[in-house]
Amino acid sequence: ILVWGTEAQKQAFLPPIYRGEVRTWQLLTEPGAGSDLAGVTTAAIRDGDEYVITGQKIFVGSDHGADRIWMIACTKPGGPRHENLSWFMLDASLPGITVQPMELMGTGGEGGTDPVQKNTVFFDQVRVPAFALIGGENQGWKAASTHLELEHGAGGRIGRNRVWDRLLRYAEPYWEVLLIH
């Protein structure tokens, strides 16, 4: 959002995240696509001022739930890979979104095991305002690449520092609020 969002999207989405008022989940992985992010099949089809999202994502989040979801979806089914994807930030409570827990074995303390909860998230004709589209239709590969670069640290320190500097400049008006709370 910081890099690819419009100013209106930054104003709507970022302050509540900075203030810790909302919990977010990223939804990338799909059954059958695994780590092939360009192979997602969850569809987001434009219908007037909305997108209708249908599909599912797996290995999502934790048992704490989410208020907002950022996700990649296919907005041009059958289109060229990497040129048919779009990035969205949407309200997790929209009608048609169902979260189903997946109990998985994870690593616990002292090398033991603990159950680790992830979720499957289903989208059944979820209507999302076009405002939720980040970075432009069919430009999701760029947004996802930027997101993963920041998350995983690929692309080198210079790129991360530049984005971090932008983040700090953007958050500066909220520092007092952040420090008080």
Which ranges hold each PLM region?
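A cross-family signal for key residues in well-ordered alpha-helices
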Residues: 2, 72, 181
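FAD-binding core of flavoproteins
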Residues: 9-166
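Membrane-integrated ABC transporters
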Residues: 168-181
